[in-house]
Amino acid sequence: MKISSGAINFSTIPNQVKKLITSIREHTKNGLTSKITSVKNTHTSLNEKFKTGKDSPIEFALPQKIKDFFQPKDKNTLNKTLITVKNIKDTNNAGKKNISAEDVSKMNAAFMRKHIANQTCDYNYRMTGAAPLPGGVSVSANNRPTVSEGRTPPVSPSLSLQATSSPSSPADWAKKLTDAVLRQKAGEALTAADRDFSNADFRNITFSKILPPSFMERDGDIIKGFNFSNSKFTYSDISHLHFDECRFTYSTLSDVVCSNTKFSNSDMNEVFLQYSITTQQQPSFIDTTLKNTLIRHKANLSGVILNEPDNSSPPSVSGGGNFIRLGDIWLQMPLLWTENAVDGFLNHEHNNGKSILMTIDSLPDKYSQEKVQAMEDLVKSLRGGRLTEACIRPVESSLVSVLAHPPYTQSALISEWLGPVQERFFAHQCQTYNDVPLPAPDTYYQQRILPVLLDSFDRNSAAMTTHSGLFNQVILHCMTGVDCTDGTRQKAAALYEQYLAHPAVSPHIHNGLFGNYDGSPDWTTRAADNFLLLSSQDSDTAMMLSTDTLLTMLNPTPDTAWDNFYLLRAGENVSTAQISPVELFRHDFPVFLAAFNQQATQRRFGELIDIILSTEEHGELNQQFLAATNQKHSTVKLIDDASVSRLATIFDPLLPEGKLSPAHYQHILSAYHLTDATPQKQAETLFCLSTAFARYSSSAIFGTEHDSPPALRGYAEALMQKAWELSPAIFPSSEQFTEWSDRFHGLHGAFTCTSVVADSMQRHARKYFPSVLSSILPLAWA
């Protein structure tokens, strides 16, 4: 019989114990019996030496070092050690013929180290509460250093040499794991026994509280090679940890928080894995097996290794449950398809991208057969649930985002069931997004929804013209989406060719303006006018615009130009100068109306009109001034004598000596919340208001090429003068200021065209304080 006690790390044992063991090893080489006698009933001798009582059973002849090592108060420790030594002797005698002297020495040394450590540490903790010192040393009541069992674990057990008992509580298990993990982190080579945490109990343990932060960091420390089989992790929190080459077989991970937990190269077979709803980020499984493991319906299985399923029965869970197979994994299903179950299991668009659909689809393509089989089982379950259209409606988008793509389109069962669902989804998209912009398409939308919409338009080509607002948006996002595939772009371009060939569309593209100017789209540049939207009211009217213009009008900024398009009637370009953008959008192209109105509400020029022309006294003029801001050109002119006189009556009191009256100036500051603003901020606002009144006085609005209302020119110049007084720095130069002032009044031979002045001032404001200009200037004038 060959017995090996394994290697002993003497570097972790205090010097006194080293000397003790060395002495014992020397004695055991000589047969041990020369120094240790058999048991005698010498009660008196022991009484005298240790005061232990009449029945002490042992007399010994150990080296003086052992006697000196223990004090009388350590008598129990000493007795246990002596019994151990006797056992060593008996074992030596029994196996003397089959055990080499070297093995005897190793075995005796291991026993001595083990028991001295156990008993002395036990004495320290139970009698004195002494804490271990660094390196595994503690101090006993007699101030003698001892080996701490908690700091220097025994070597790998062989045969019956292991005497360590399992921890009795989750806290003890956590402490043991912390010790082992830290030793591994320090570079110590752990034995299989060191890494054996089978049948452990980690219930309610938050691992971030027992491990250093480095284990929770991205690409941080790893828990590697541990055996957690048949262990309990119920209600524990293992978030952000990385377990590599670990075994969790038959373990219970019920209501465990495992946000962003990584399992790699691990065995998680036969595990009950239902992580807590507080898990915010899904755990990941990389090259990990999950045979017969119960998985929640919101898991990511992209790195799982599937194998052939066996004939095992579904797992039993409290409250019962339905299950489907995904390869050799069990996926939990609801008992009944209630409204809550439909939302919770199927609606990943409402549940942070998590659903049973996404769980199945997360497997690699090499498991296509298993994925299709699982989806077919899911569809059978849904079909058996006899769900109404109203119940399915909230999850139609989620369903088609997965099932309308390969490999599931290869299944006749899935395609037959999904067909009506996809038709209803498409009808809802047409109804909702023909007149309003689609949400900004993210990666999910570009890769999962846009291809479905293309497929639906392909099946229902009439919808391309009846819902050209939606169709053009879909093509736009397919051609510009950075996450769209080449296949998606090619299909979008092919569908648009069909659209351009439609009789309602083709008359508008052969005018030398469309695309590459010959009637074909030019997808090589976003500046080409490739898009053509049909009017929702008049089939003879269309809007032609470029990719960039369409994008900015659907998602505008304060600087968006709302007239950078061609308006076509019967294929001919018509002027939009006297067309109100808001009326054009409301009547013909409602897809832009909401965005335009939203930007218009941020323009505050009308507040000054209400100050000057109150609706109570000047209701008609108030409406004329506001209506003029909705178009680039006005047919109403205010240059006749009656109009000039009326305007002078209104504006002259505001401009004593040609300057803003203090009271009127304060009204302006109050209306635009500038009372406490800096002089520069006040000046920028007055400058922009001046550009607007310069526009009023020009031939584009209330003036003509040869005449303009003097009151409006004078008011525009007074606003500019006040801006100069407040902050000359906002002007290009004093010379430019003087030139603009002269143009307002025709002084010093200056050309009096206020349209030129308005354009020049507007360009300057857009360059140096665009946000102020965008908050004031009417959209139609921008």
Swiss-Prot record:
Name by which UniProt lists this protein: E3 ubiquitin-protein ligase SopA
UniProt keywords, alphabetically: Secreted, Transferase, Ubl conjugation, Ubl conjugation pathway, Virulence
UniProt biased composition (Low complexity): 157-171
Active-site annotation: 753 (glycyl thioester intermediate)
GO molecular function: ubiquitin-protein transferase activity
Superkingdom of this protein's organism: Bacteria
Residue ranges of the region described as Disordered: 136-171
Pfam families xref list: SopA, SopA_C
EC number: 2.3.2.26
Any GO BP annotation: protein ubiquitination
Stated family: Belongs to the SopA E3 ligase family.
Listed InterPro entries: SopA-like_cat, SopA-like_catalytic_sf, SopA-like_central
PTM comment text: Ubiquitinated in the presence of host E1 ubiquitin-activating enzyme, E2 ubiquitin-conjugating enzyme and ubiquitin.
Predominant location category: secreted
GO cellular component: extracellular region; host cell
Function: Effector proteins function to alter host cell physiology and promote bacterial survival in host tissues. This protein is an E3 ubiquitin ligase that interferes with host's ubiquitination pathway. For instance, prevents host innate immune response by ubiquitinating and thus sending to degradation host E3 ubiquitin ligases TRIM56 and TRIM65.
Reaction catalyzed: S-ubiquitinyl-[E2 ubiquitin-conjugating enzyme]-L-cysteine + [acceptor protein]-L-lysine = [E2 ubiquitin-conjugating enzyme]-L-cysteine + N(6)-ubiquitinyl-[acceptor protein]-L-lysine
Localization (cell): Secreted; Host cell
